[in-house]
Amino acid sequence: MAESRPLSEEEITKIGNPAKPTGEAGSQMLERMNDSHYEVTGWALDFFHFTDTDNILDIGCGGGRTLHRMSERSRRGKLTGVDYSPVSVEESRKYNAEDITSGKMNILQGSVDQLPLPDDSFDRIITVESFYFWPDAVKDLKEVRRVLKEGGQFILVADIYNRDDLPASAVEHIREYDMRNPTLDEFRSYFEQAGFRDITIHLKNGSTWIAVEAEK
């Protein structure tokens, strides 16, 4: 019997489903995303005004590394992760087992269109590389705003946005996975329609990275 060959990264992504990670391929994909999202996330985290007592939410927490990094920046804070993929919830819990055991962190299964969280709960909210797959941009942003405290800070992070010079490979990826990919004007419009204020769009020189920062 011939030995099966290892799956390529592209095959793992297709089987694992970036919109909702599933199965062993999903676990492998999340492990890779913990690394591939590291730099863009670090760039965006510098826009947060962390304090030691923040209540922080990560929507679409994936493999859990962003939660861990924010925990390091808010030593006495409380952190919550939400993801609608059971595989993501499991992997995030594994990655952050120590903080969960101590009671500092909680990771829940849920969707951005109906967050299982009370109103006005969080000082900081972040979402990294998940907005592409949200069901309804404005409605879901309103749901994010609902759980953000008055004066709280929200940052949406993505490594691409709709512009004329996107590589052909990125355009094909967007098409293949039916990803939402707004222009800068569309991003601002979504946030305004959702009721956010003080909207700032950060762009990384020499890249296609974007971080949309706003307050309630």
Report each predicted region and the residues it spans:
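C-terminal alpha-helical "lid/dimerization" subdomain adjacent to the S-adenosyl-L-methionine
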Residues: 5-34, 153-213
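Conserved alpha-helix/loop element of class I SAM-dependent methyltransferases that forms part
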Residues: 35-54
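Glycine-rich helix-loop-beta junction characteristic of Rossmann-like nucleotide cofactor-binding loops
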Residues: 46-51, 72, 115-116
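Short glycine-dipeptide loop
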Residues: 53, 148-154
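Class I SAM-dependent methyltransferase SAM/SAH-binding core
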Residues: 55-114
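A short acidic, Gly/Pro-enriched loop at the edge of an enzyme's catalytic core
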Residues: 113-124
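A short SAM/SAH-binding and catalytic strip from SAM-dependent methyltransferases
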Residues: 124-136
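A short glycine-rich, Lys/Arg-flanked "PGG" loop and its adjoining helix->strand segment in the class I
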Residues: 138-150
